[in-house]
Structures are given as C-alpha cells and as structure tokens.
Amino acid sequence: MKNLKRVLVSLVLIGLLVLLAFQVFKAYMRPQYQGTQSLSGLSEEVRVYFDSYGIPHIYANSEADAFKALGYVHAQDRLWQMEVLRRIGAGRLSELFGADLIETDKLFLSLGIDAASEKSVAQLETSSASYQLSMAYLDGINAFIASGPTPVEFLLTGTEKKAFELKDIYNTIGYMAFSFAVAHRTDPLLSEIHSDFGPEYLKDLSVDYDPKTLAIATYKGPMDQIASLLEKVPAPQFIGSNAWVIGSKKTKNGSVIFANDPHIGYAQPAVWYEAHIQTPTYENYGHHLAGVPFPLLAHNRKLAYGLTMFENDDIDFYSTETQPGNPDKYKYEKEWLPFRVQEKTIAVKDATPVNYLVKQTVHGPIMNDIVAGVNKIQPISMSWVYTQKSNEVLQSLYRISHARGMLDFKNALSGIHAPGLNVMYGDAQGNIAWWATAALYDLPEGVSTTFILDGRGASQEKISYLPFSENPSSENPPWDYVYSANNAPQPVSGKTYPGYYLPENRAKRINNLLLAKDNWDINSVSEMITDHTSAVNPDLVKHFMKSMRAQKSLTPPLSKAQQEAIENIESWDGSYALEQTASALFHKWEYYFLKNV
C-alpha cells in the first residue's frame, strides 16, 4: 500500500513538474507585447502599442527606426511563416519537411525565381530609400532572430534560425507571383483538348485556335502534376478578390469610400500582417506579406489603395524540336543551338542531397524534366514574364506606399511587371482610379497564347512589350465608381488582352449594385461586401428551362417532388442565403449538365 502511495505521489509530482515546465516554456515563447526591449541601431526611442487584436501601432521619429521596429515585431509574430515563404520560391522546402517536397522544390528551383532574385538585388541602388528601408526591416528581423525566443516550429523540425537577406524578399514575392498564374494549368489542357477532339470542340468553348499554333499530343499530365505540387506548398493560395471605389457624388457624406476584399485561402497564421506606422514623413495602416517591408494594401489620411489579381497571361509554353540523333541541341531560327544546362542540388532532411539537371532554351526551362509524369518525347519550355524582365517590384511597393497623390501613385506602378494586378485607388481629394499593372505584350497576328506555341522561330514570339500607358485603366470616370472582380477588362483602342479572367458573376453583381444607388455609406458598403446574390445564375436557369421544355418529348414525366424542385428553382432570385435550397438545386443541375455535355 505504501509503495502504491509513493508511486501515485511520484506521478503527481512528475505531472506538476511537466505542467510547470510547459507553462514556463509557453511564457518564454509568447510574443512580448509590453515592457521595454533593447534594439541596437535605433537612432531614437520607438514606441510600439499593440491593440486588442494584437496589431502593432509603431511611432518613431524616423522611417529607418520605424521599419526596423516593424521587422522585429513582424518576426516575433510570424518568423516561421517568413521562413517557409522565403524557402518556397528558392526550392528549399525539402530541408524542412523531407523527401515529400523534392518534386515541389524541383519545380520552383527550375523556374529560376532564386536566380531572378539575385539579379534584382544586384540592380538595386544602395543609396535609394527603398533599399535602405528594406535593410532596416531586415535588420529588425535579424535582431529578433539573434536575441528573441526560438519559435516552436524550428524546434520541432530541427531547423536552425538563419539571418534574412534582400534576396529572401524577392523570393517571397516570386512565389506569390507564380501562385497567381493560371497558364500552367490551362494552356496544356487546351492543347490536349484540341489534339484529342479537334478545333470544332474549342469553338464550342469560345476559344480561338490559331491553326499555326502547334497541338502537342504528347504533352499530357502537367496540369494535374503542377496543381498537386502547389497543393503541397504550406502556404495559402489567392483564390479571387473583389474591390470597388465609390466617388464622392455617390456617397452620403461626399467623400470617397474604398472597399477591398482579397479572397485568400484560410490559413493560420493569416497571410496578411496588419501594422500601423507613423513618423513625421510617413504614415500608413497597411497589410504586409510575411518578410516584405512595404504594404500591398494600405490607407492613410490622404489616400487608400488595394488590389485584385489582373489574371493576364504572363506565362507562355513553347514546343521544342531537338536535333535528330543529338538531344543536346534544339532548333531555333533555322539553327541548332545547344541547350543551356545547369546542375541543381536540393538538400533533403534526413536524406542524401538530390542532384538534377535543368535544360533551358531561349524561352526558359524545359518542363518535361521538372514535372513527373510528363511525356519526354517533345520538350516543352516555359517563358515567364517575372523572370524574363528586370524586376522593380520592391521599388514600386516603396513608391506607392509613399505616394502623396494620384499622379505620384500612378507613376509608381509601371515597375510592376508580374504578377498582373488590378490596383485600386481613392483619395481625400475625391479622386478614384483603377490601373492594370503588368508587362503586357504584342504577339504576331493570329497567335493565341492559350495554346502551346511553336518554339522553332520568331513567328510566335513576343513582338514587343507595351508601354504602361496602354494598360487598361479608369481614372475618375463619369459614372463615379471603379471596380474589379478578376474579370476581363474592356478593349483599349480596340485591343484585347489575353488572360484567364474569371466569369462575370461577381463583377456583374458589383456593377449592378453600385449603379443603382447614390447614397452609399460605410454601413451599406459593409453589407455589400457580404452580399450573396448571383447576377448571372438565374439567367442560366431560364436557359436550362427553355432547353428542357424544347426537349419535352424526350423527358419522362416528372414526379411531384421533381415538379416542386423545378418550381423552386424557377422562382430563384440568385440568393445564396443559408435557408435557400434553390441554389443547391441549381449547382447540382449545373454539375450534371456540364458532365453530360
């Protein structure tokens, strides 16, 4: 009995010690939201207040001090997120998570994001404000790495904390740019459809097919392969966005109202990091990406800006003809050129490093050797604007975050080549605007970038990049509002821009609501953000019903339940309220219609 008592007492003591150790560890790991923290390199004291949501409000007498403090508090809240994001574009996830991520690393390493980042860093002017504030931000991150507690994720994965550098900012932006792209999912699929079913099938899909564009029957599998690789990435994807800016003539108080709702997959921690910074020369309440110093969405007392994805086509695929008997050369402009070959190494946790070769043409990397499951017979190379053109995105983000007015803001946008963005703007002077930022380009007549192109010569090459002034935009339109929902822009000077724009459903609803009302206020705009009515699907119901009635002789008699379902869906107003059943019936109907047709 005494022995049992001793055992029980021992177990209780051990349990208490474990609990105490856990509480001490938890307290050690908790971010510091009160007290004083010594941070070397500050010129003066910086005050940081955290509100009830944990959002930092940073007050400093210089921008350099403010951005250094931002880097520190950003790191104490999100260091592991920063670590993961900087590794994705560089192809270094396998170092953290092991062999399961090798193919994902191979994809991103081969895309050339890391190499493009190195070039961008080399081109930065070290005397520029964008460079100096970026370095101040990185100094803050690295100060936390040196003196702050180690996040538990580093301990669990056995990962050593290492200092951040400028290249990491670009690698994070590069991953985000690729995650927004759609061509790698769509172009091969359309080429495969043409190969299997012919051009008539594509006409039914409202896709223009250029007979000069090659249909590559051997290029099968990459869509699913790349999609599955992206799904393994431990970071959420952008899945669409809404934004609108209402001019002073359509609001109750005569001031501009700005609304932006980026649709990003749920994640913990969230993609955005909110922070408010105030100095004598700078103030913004902004939303930052992990590891990026300047906000992508922000507002201050003078202006507000935000974004949606433009969805333009900035990735092209080119078929490549190899020399008979010599797979080390390919045909371009009637010459046989050697592939540029680079050896890459992927470090893998608890395993030997993986070495592989990346072959490149004048267009970019050969994808067949990168994505498992792709037929090797005909090489396909990928040309991506992000890595092809000089990248000035960091400078542009600095300039838009420091803009004093609309002209200043607009002039800052031309350096954003990829990803394509719809940048929304409103200011206290009553100006509203929308600009599409992207490096758009001309192609030869009749060439469609929605298919795999002929890479043997210049007949399907980019002719030239268009000046930013020719990009779609709208500044202070007479109807007094601008909006974007990832929808296609109207032609500019008769010119359309190829892209993977989303259906008009959201855009049409936004336009209908904005057009019908002239007394908007904060409350009504907030209600609009959560609107759940489709402006398109009720019209589709009418077409479905018309088609069904035209085939009445082929349709068996309906049961009472079926007839009630028909009546329910016919009276549907497009609402997706929780108690609404017609919306569920519509999508079930739509599913079988698409499946069978």
Go through the PLM ranges and name each one.
Residues 12, 43-48, 393-415:
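Alpha/propeptide regions of enzymes that mature by internal proteolysis
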Residues 20-257, 262-265, 281, 286, ...:
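Substrate-recognition/specificity elements adjacent to catalytic centers across diverse enzyme folds
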Residues 59, 67-68, 254-255, 266-269, ...:
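Short helix/loop capping segments that flank catalytic or ligand/cofactor-binding pockets
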Residues 66-69, 116-132, 383, 394-400, ...:
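Second-shell loop/turn segments in exported
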Residues 283-284, 289-354, 400:
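Compact, glycine/acidic-enriched structural inserts
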Residues 390, 404-410, 417, 495-597:
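Ordered core of a single globular domain
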Residues 418-517, 593-595:
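Hydrophobic alpha-helical segments
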